């Protein structure tokens, strides 16, 4: 069954494996999450657990948020997300979910909001090739042809300049290198989406290969 937790991306560092290999890892701080609600097929049409992460003061929360958190005997939360596919019988409302639900060697999917890059050209945004940079060339970094004359329009899939980044991105099949329950840290091999301090969701991998 699926396991999941919410956390914040702290940054990247390096650790050594037992065989001496240097492994680049991303550090994720996941302070204890609280189960705010259990979604059931009978009542909601699907099964999921609703997790709350990071307390906020009641002054910054509205009455529905305060009341919803009170049912779980906890403070209002800054972030609330659902984890589908979890075995809801293993969870109770008000229960804390900590990093020790994962173990070293587990394969996970990490979801976050990618870094916003603003308005970018086709070369940076789509990886297109640039034109000749010589003095005689009049074509350097433009998108190129918009298409043939006949359709009298630009096709929908044409790669053009525009807003880049700031989108929900999931990187699959990342390996957990280390779990530190005392400091609420997960060390995950490779990079994960988003800026430092950005919210990330760590879940059991959907497409993990069987051992």
From Swiss-Prot:
Complex and partners: Part of the 50S ribosomal subunit. Forms a cluster with proteins L14 and L19.
Listed InterPro entries: Ribosomal_uL3, Ribosomal_uL3_bac/org-type, Ribosomal_uL3_CS, Transl_B-barrel_sf
Pfam families, per database record: Ribosomal_L3
Entry GO CC: cytosolic large ribosomal subunit
GO MF term (any one): rRNA binding
Keywords: Ribonucleoprotein, Ribosomal protein, RNA-binding, rRNA-binding
Residue numbers spanned by region Disordered: 122-147
Signal peptide feature range: none
Biological process terms in GO annotation: translation
Its biological purpose: One of the primary rRNA binding proteins, it binds directly near the 3'-end of the 23S rRNA, where it nucleates assembly of the 50S subunit.
Protein name, UniProt field: Large ribosomal subunit protein uL3
Superkingdom assignment: Bacteria
HAMAP family per record: Ribosomal_uL3_B
Family: Belongs to the universal ribosomal protein uL3 family.
């Amino acid at each position: 069954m699926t396991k999941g937790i919410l956390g914040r991306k702290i940054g990247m560092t390096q650790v050594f494996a037992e065989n001496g290999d240097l492994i680049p890892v991303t550090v994720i701080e996941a302070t204890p999450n609280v189960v705010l609600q259990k979604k059931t097929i009978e009542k909601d049409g699907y099964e999921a657990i609703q997790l709350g992460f990071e307390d906020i003061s009641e002054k910054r929360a509205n009455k529905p948020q305060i009341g919803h958190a009170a049912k779980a005997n906890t403070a209002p939360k800054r972030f609330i997300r659902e984890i589908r596919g979890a075995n809801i019988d293993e969870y109770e409302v008000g229960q804390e979910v900590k990093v020790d639900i994962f173990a070293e060697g587990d394969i996970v999917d990490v979801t976050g909001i990618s870094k916003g890059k603003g308005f970018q050209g086709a070369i940076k945004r789509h990886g297109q090739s640039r034109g000749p940079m010589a003095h005689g060339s009049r074509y350097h970094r433009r998108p190129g042809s918009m298409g043939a004359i006949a359709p009298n329009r630009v096709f929908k899939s044409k790669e053009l300049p525009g807003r880049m980044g700031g989108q929900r991105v999931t990187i699959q099949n990342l390996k957990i290198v280390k779990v530190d329950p005392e400091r609420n840290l997960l060390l995950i091999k490779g990079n994960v989406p988003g800026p430092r301090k950005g919210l990330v969701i760590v879940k059991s991998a959907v497409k993990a290969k069987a051992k």
